[in-house]
Amino acid sequence: RCLVGSEMCIRDRNGTSMATPVVAGAAALARQFLRLEGVSEPRSDLIRAILINGAEDIGISDIPNPSEGWGQLSLDNSLYPISHSGRDMSVMYDYTRELSPGHGFTYTIDVEPGAGLDITLAWNDLKGSSVANQSAARLVNDLDLTVTSPDGITYLGNHFDSGFSVTGGIEDRPVSYTHLRAHETPVN
């Protein structure tokens, strides 16, 4: 309890001990928001993708990293994304389709010139084998996110420089999320 005289005050705390309850509370608020928007049973992978997509890089190269993860949580950015120029950004949630092994989905997205693009793919993986080699990846479903620009340049998820996706890199393993952030470039 923090008191200044007889008045309550706010204390500043940091670290994972404070970040965990903040993110848990934000996840609960995001779930409530989705329910009010008509998503009757929002899954945890959808909520995780929303929170990752709205995070703000706080300056430690490069995201994600052990010091800041995906950055500072911003529920405003997550639920009401706005571009750097102040325009409302379109949001698409597709969590109704199932992907069969060895197959993929292709989406064509038109992006206005000068607008950026943030994409997060997240999923709840099946439990791994308890008899698998302890040093082996336990990921059962290994999904990859790639984005190809109109001029044929391909970007892989989770490959960043200065907070933005860059070409090159290798497929990211073993994680159950992948993220891509494009500069204000013509990507569709």
Question: In which residue ranges do the predicted regions lie?
Answer:
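Short glycine/serine/threonine-biased micro-segments
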Residues: 3, 13, 67-69
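Conserved beta-strand and immediately adjacent loop positions that scaffold enzyme active sites
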Residues: 7, 142-144
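Secreted peptidase-domain scaffold signal
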Residues: 64-141, 149
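Hydrolase catalytic cores
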Residues: 6-7, 11-61
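Single conserved hydrophobic/aromatic residue that forms the stacking wall/gate
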Residues: 1-10, 179-182, 186-188
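Noncatalytic accessory or regulatory domains flanking protease catalytic cores in secreted, cell-surface
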Residues: 11-16, 64, 146-181
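Acidic glycine-/aspartate-rich tracts in secreted/extracellular proteins
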Residues: 56-59, 124-126, 152
